[in-house]
């Protein structure tokens, strides 16, 4: 039985050993861990920059939704943005028994499923591809409004897509913690040993966090012992849930909203303290003064994580062309077929041909033939089906788009500037917008794309829905236990937020709404 551990006893004396001065936070959640993380990616990077930390890893729940914003914010201040995710994993076994019911034999299968959260870090481009495959697998086989735990990958799927990924054993909801808490000592390393088998011993790190929690520290002792038995490297993280200590209050509100409870009744659903903020290397070294290797390993592991989003690049999809054609030749043929129809064979065609050749050479150089052919294919389908379709925006500046029938404005005759649409110097991809009717006709076009290119070869852009001021005020008011009348006044106040004279203040506005501050 573990002894009582207080705040002081968790931090061994440090006078006899030097403290590491370098540390990289490799386990942080953002607000893209919906209603779990309380800080935006930009706020996490700002806290990291203020502490002169050279890198940070973002691991959101079951997705990489915040990765782009995290990467862009990090690039602006010279911080390396490591990417990963916390994946929900289901380890499942079957217990088959037979029982007799009304004289007939009935086979009943009891499935015992253990679900845990597995932090994964991306080591290289292959790892990014594999993590995305795992996320896609889990998302596509569950209902749209799946309950927590329904969306999960299996250990066998992890084994199929483990290349390029680094595995951490996680915190209180990780595989090793669940083994320690719920299984006997003979089985307590079963899942961890399977993870070693899947990822390789050098790619599995025993994660340790210290938030002045007795149960957590007792678990840490067991993790350290198991790590030494299995020859795993120790890794210190702070399990970041918010950028600053003050944001803990936001995290508590999110916890209440997620669990549909008021703050006064949330109880043990809330974190016991506000320690999950971005801490300095000095603070983290002090927390792990007895385990300097756990701090040093953060720097070592960070150096192994070669991948950032700037290495991803983009490969445009390939259009299926006849066996005797290339995408370049097929696009050229379709373009000139349309150009002869649009411009005829007079002097106007000669003038247009010069512009078309200029555009085709740039399209070929940038390897964009597939993109133009796919858009052309969608437009052709719509025309065959009698669906109104029209390209718009800067695509109207392209003679190739005009010749392919994507747009309706002659850019040569109108002397429009092609480089406004596509320019090698600008380094931006072209954007061809297609206007379609709403309703069934639009849906028919979408379904054609899925059928033509396959369910894994096409996707719709997802929108992240965020709280506006009025809805946010109502949700926070519910958490604080306000009655309906007060909620109405509060949301109305935020909805029309303005200061009409210099004497107006936030405090006065709330008092005018009848709120006792």
Positions of PLM-derived features:
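Alpha-helical scaffold/interaction cores of sigma-54-like transcription cofactors
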Residues: 2-93, 100, 110-517
